[in-house]
Structure formats: C-alpha cells, structure tokens
Amino acid sequence: MLRLALVLNRHLPRMAGIAMIPLVRCLFWLARLLGTERASRTGGAIARRVGPFLPANRIALANLRAAYPEEDEAAIRALARQAWDNLGRTGAEYAHLATLFDIDPADPASQRMSVAGAEHFEALRDDGKPGLIFAAHLANWELPAICAARYGLEATAIFRPPNDIASARLVAEVRRETMGGLAAAGQGAVFSMQGVVERGGHLGQLIDQHFTRGVVVEFFGRPVLVNPLLAKLAKHYECPVHGVRVVRKDNARFHLELTPPLDLPRDAKGEIDVQGAMQAMTRVVEEWVRENPGQWLWMHRRWRPNMLPKPKVAPVKQPDPSAAHRGNVTSVSG
C-alpha cells in the first residue's frame, strides 16, 4: 500500500495533466469559435473575476505594493485586476495567434498591429550578423516572435513551457505553426543557443523572470536575479542587442516596438560588462512596465530576497601571537 501511495504521489500530477488535455483543447476550440475580439474579451472577463481568488493574486498584490508604495490599496487592487485581464486575454488569444499578426503597411487603419522600428527588423535581417533581442511578459508577449518570422528574420525564441502538460502541448503546437526557431530553456539549452549565434542567427529571450543562477540587478529599486545569457553572448560575439515590447490597445489590437541597439557598458578592457549590460536591459524593461503596469505579469515571484547571494565579508585578521611575544621580549630587554 505504501509503495502504491508513493507511485501515485509521483505520477498523479502527470496523470492529472494528461486528463486535462481534452478540456484545454475544448476551451481552445471554443475560443476559436468566438472569434478574436470576443475570445479576448471573454478571456479577460473570466480572469478578472476568477484571478483575485487565486493564490497567485497574493503574489501580485505584494509585488505591486512594493513597486508602488505611494499608491493606495484601491489603486493596487485595480492594477492587479488589469494584470489578470491581460493574462486572460493573452491566454484566449493563443487560439488566434496565426491570424493576430495581420499587418499591412498599405492599409494600417484596418490592421490589428502597428510596428515601430521595422527598419531595425530589416537591418537585423539583412546585415549578415548575429543579433540578440530581449523582451518582457507585457501585453501579448508571443507577438514579437511572430513579427520576426513575418519580416523574414531568422530568429530563435527561448521559451519556458507551461507547467501543466495540457497547456504545454497546445502552446507548443501554436508556436510551431506561427514562429521561427524555438529553444526550450533548460540545462542543455545554452549550447544550442550559442550555436544559433555562431551561425549568424538571432536569439530572443524574455528577461523579466527570476533566474536562480543569475546576476544581481535592480528592478523597481530592489535587487533581483536575472539570466545573464544575452549579455554573455553579446560580450563573446560582439553582436547588437535590441529590446522589443508589445503594448495592448483596444479590441485585441497591439503596438509592437523594436528599439535601436543598446549602448551597453564596458569594462576597463573595453569588453561588455555582463552585470552592467543586464542592468541596462532591465532598466529598459522597468520603463516599459511603468508605462503600462496593468499589462505586466505581476503574479510571478520576481523578487526573492532570500535567494540573493550573501555579501562577501572580508575575513577578520587574527592577532599574530608570535609578534606580540616578540614585542614583549623587546620591551623587557630594553
């Protein structure tokens, strides 16, 4: 009986995830049936109502209170509801990712997307050099990878699959249909990412989540750990680093912006400073979040002070007994 309990305890989450696959696919089918705008509105409405009762809402509220200490509780809770609305909309929009990016420069008024910095996409595509792009969980954060593919930019997006099997399978299918290269974050992923850059390709990564083995930077005035991969690659290959963000407009419409290459700080030897480079990227992300705080993923435990590296304390010099003894001998002989 004990052995059976241990087996069930180990495999129950996976079994539950597999059992959820039909339900998730039914919801996906329903979202497609509703159409883009109705699905987005419905997903947002459900998340606004359900989200505040979920455990993750406590994380969102704590993060918002720390980031905006000057705001009252009503404003904090309103921002949390906006964040839930954005998350619900983004989830529902997965059913329409293949058609969501429908930009037509000849008829911009009728399109769901507008793009600023298209010339940077084209420059990255045509310069024959590798390039790096950082992003954040803002608005519908899947759209930059789709935009790159539509502009003919060979790019590989680094992604972290959802925890539950049902969502992970469905999201992977949608991403394969709409995006360029994909690389799952993990232990062995660094080598494949390095290979992308060595071949002259382009790599995109979301940098606004906790990374245990990361470097320390400041985000909203508090220390956080960030994955240093992009800075290390920029240092090694001397390739440009751009930022990309999405801003949600009304009725499932979006504005996408690709920044010019960042001027990253360098050390005394003229090489890119990894910690300084990640701080520069994180500063850009903070500016984006401050512009549209209700469109960021506040439910993530971005600040984890107990996981920060302990400050190094210089060892206290112990007195040398032999020196004291020599001093005593000298004073006696004098």
Q: Where do the model's predicted regions map?
A:
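Membrane-anchoring hydrophobic helices of lipid-metabolizing enzymes
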Residues: L2-A135, L170-A172, M179, A323-V332
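Non-catalytic C-terminal accessory region of glycerolipid acyltransferases
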Residues: H11, M15, E70, R81, ...
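Short, composition-biased local secondary-structure segments
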Residues: W29-L34, N140-A145, M193-G204
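Active-site metal-coordination segments of metallo-dependent hydrolases
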Residues: R58-I59, R160-I165, V224-N227
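Catalytic core of membrane glycerolipid acyltransferases/transacylases, capturing the structured
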Residues: N86, L100, D126-G186, T212-V217, ...
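Short, flexible loop segments at the rims of nucleotide/cofactor-binding pockets, characterized by
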Residues: D107-M113, R160, M179-A184, F219-G221, ...
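Short amphipathic alpha-helical segments and helix-helix/interface helices
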Residues: F121-E122, A145, V171-A172, M193-Q194, ...
